[in-house]
């Protein structure tokens, strides 16, 4: 219950994202965002996307203590558990994975229908490493336009 309360608290904090786009696509952009999003999430391309997000989380686990919310809380999950959870979520087209960095008071959220990972309340230390990890996976790190505090 304590970790659930912590998640609720962190979801109200400043949010950053690691994603495939360098900035939020505006509703009036005139492009084909929804077609592209659907394609990336529902074609064979979703395997590449899954691999990138798994790699981000695994790399993060090298630098920080991590607990995940997957069928209960798992402290210091194995790399296989992380990959299995994300694969199952993407395969089912349903669900999310909460990744808590308890010593940093930071929350990373993976949702099956998003082209990004949301990172709530990252310290400067977490921001620095996440930006480098994002670049290493061909992704972008930016402050979210949502949840600004």
Predicted regions and their residues:
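Structured alpha/beta or helical-core interaction and ligand-binding surfaces enriched in interleaved
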Residues: 1-116, 121-149
